[in-house]
Amino acid sequence: MIRIAFLITNKFLEIDSTTLAGYDFSGMNLHRAILNGYCLDGAKFEKTHLRNVMIQHTSTRNAVFHNAALMNAILNNSDFTGSDCSNSRSIGENFKAIDNHGKDIINGKGLSNVCKIHYNV
């Protein structure tokens, strides 16, 4: 059982699994979820509400964030290699020290509607 905490609300989401790798979060409301340190490789976040989510020090290789709402997400020091962020909505995120192995997550399969972002890749 994995227990995901949410900022400010003191709420939790319990997932009956031993790993989040490959987990399908599509369409879920994960506003303010703390996903720091989990392995999210291959996870699906299609049309997921990820506003103010924290994904720090996390592997998200080959994860799918297609059409996800990523406004004000904190994505520091995470590995997004091979992840699909196409058509995701992102305003005000912090991408400090994201490891994308030289691939551009902003163009191509990157984020759309990007502004006010601090890049340090």
Task: Please tell me what each predicted stretch does.
Residues 1-121:
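Tandem repeat scaffolds
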